[in-house]
């Protein structure tokens, strides 16, 4: 690093806005939310989503409550074009959802983009071109008027093509890319020219999106830029003012919140902050920040674990255990004083009261999470944690969420006995909790076979004391076994690893499932010399543990068969 960074880097100039109003404003309602997980988020992945993952992400976004979803960049990719056609032609876009597509400001790309939306009921066509000096001068070698002409010619072309597709309810959107690095008077000049062509008005609103394509300054600077545009743009009553913050400086959430205070009506971003470089603004954090202040965000995150696991599956990116609201450790206290304060706060809280539990900004139950994982041991009074001892003594590496779950079982034992637990005690607790449960279902044996290109399985079990042989098929052994057993749980996550090495090696399988009738996911564990057998044992372990939370009268409904 340089001793004097000022010789290489320049401080961002403040905005001349001496009478700024945003510092005295408060947020009282949610913005319009636009998810760009399928476009900006997808293009930033090591391996972009395939059609199956894209569709799963789209359906989840709809379920959460997004009414505007940017589904792709159809002129840049045949895959994106085909996916958008699939959504339109198969009627997968609900009537109250606007599908959005992005295009560069080039005639042939605009034409291809508009073609992708033929037959759509509600569509947003989003065109952009870079307006910042370094892009004008270095990348495009254009003057201001040349850049402005690109924007206006594109706006005119979009308007003309839209008139030939009257079956679609169109919304036009323009972004001066790298707005945060563009001179404000020039950004206004370009935007005003575009909104004039589109005849923006109260009955014909357009979206003007002001992106921090690269986050260049502190959030207050971005707020000043947004307020300046909010106060100076022509045809403001015909504009939905949108922001698209990136997280290069780590303050995208704050920038978005201050931008809303400064006059923004709409926010574009991704679940859990996915996106180019350091990511887009995290819409989950933004929404739950509002929720924790008593404002309904209009998005449903009541099953945050399911949403997180689906996002991880679709993006193939892990969510950090410290991620706000959703990370595996955010509702977990390791400090003894924190544990004591939380216990007392939970004991004092009564349903209907204002939430004031120390260290917990909102009630985990509101997100479908449970209190059991909040208080946990972490280091056996400084002599090594539960998970450390299991790994050190038994070569068992528990997934993070299972560490949280199992530590509660250990805590119950230490609370009951008041004694220190050693590695052998922890292993005994683990066996009893996960490995030796045989009610109501016990694994006996299985065989695999091919069935019309799918995996078939015959699995022998003892259920409610009676031996049975069941058959099923699926995309793999686990899917086939789930088909055969007809268990009333949903698979959330699966992982495995080996224990030991050489001829004595075994496999351990961890299966995380959800019981639709009980909040909070739970794990099953199986250990065997054969990995498939270990997987089946883990499946039944999870089902038996789910059954243990229910009265016996409900076991048949959960585990199939008849008592």
From Swiss-Prot:
Annotated metabolic or biological route of this protein: Amino-acid biosynthesis; L-leucine biosynthesis; L-leucine from 3-methyl-2-oxobutanoate: step 1/4
One cellular-component annotation, GO: cytoplasm
Keywords recorded for this protein, A-Z: Amino-acid biosynthesis, Branched-chain amino acid biosynthesis, Cytoplasm, Leucine biosynthesis, Magnesium, Metal-binding, Transferase
Example GO molecular function: acetyl-CoA C-acetyltransferase activity
Record note on quaternary structure: Homodimer.
Cited function: Catalyzes the condensation of the acetyl group of acetyl-CoA with 3-methyl-2-oxobutanoate (2-ketoisovalerate) to form 3-carboxy-3-hydroxy-4-methylpentanoate (2-isopropylmalate).
KW Cytoplasm (keyword) present: yes
InterPro entries: 2-isopropylmalate_synth_dimer, AIPM/Hcit_synth_CS, Aldolase_TIM, IPM_Synthase, LeuA-like_post-cat, LeuA_allosteric_dom_sf, LeuA_N_DRE-TIM, PYR_CT
SUPFAM superfamilies recorded: 2-isopropylmalate synthase LeuA, allosteric (dimerisation) domain, Aldolase, post-HMGL domain-like
Cofactor(s) recorded in Swiss-Prot or TrEMBL: Mg(2+)
EC number, UniProt record: 2.3.3.13
Localization per record: Cytoplasm
Binding site for Mg(2+): 40, 244, 246, 280
PANTHER family named in the record: 2-ISOPROPYLMALATE SYNTHASE, PTHR46911
Name of this protein: 2-isopropylmalate synthase
Residue span of region Regulatory domain: 437-563
Organism: Parvibaculum lavamentivorans (strain DS-1 / DSM 13023 / NCIMB 13966)
Reaction catalysis annotation: 3-methyl-2-oxobutanoate + acetyl-CoA + H2O = (2S)-2-isopropylmalate + CoA + H(+)
GO biological process, one term: L-leucine biosynthetic process
Enzyme class: transferase
Similarity-based family: Belongs to the alpha-IPM synthase/homocitrate synthase family. LeuA type 2 subfamily.
